[in-house]
Amino acid sequence: KNSLTIDVASQSASFGGRLLNLGPRHYELLYLLVTNKGEVLSKQALMKKVFPENDESDTRFVEVYIDKLREELNENLDNPKIILNEGTTGYKIVGSHTIVRRALKETEGL
């Protein structure tokens, strides 16, 4: 079963053991969804947190970034199973998630 792991120390995430290719804002968006698991986060609230320099009523940024996160999670964009739309107002995340507060183990040098 695929589970999502968020590594707070390195600001990275992996899904099913595969490191996700996320920029800082993608990570922040994913972190907000995971730390509010099961709760609907409005597009405006996500705009305010992740894109504070933009008008929070212009939610296209959030929509584009959510689509990129879904692609990284190998989601079917027409029928997502992990990051769910809640009407037209927001998103919530479901499934198995782990938050790690220490860095992922690095391979030791020789």
Model region roles, listed by residue range:
Residues 1-27, 92-110:
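A structural micro-motif at secondary-structure boundaries
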Residues 12-87:
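Positively charged, aromatic-enriched patches within helix-turn-helix-type DNA-binding elements
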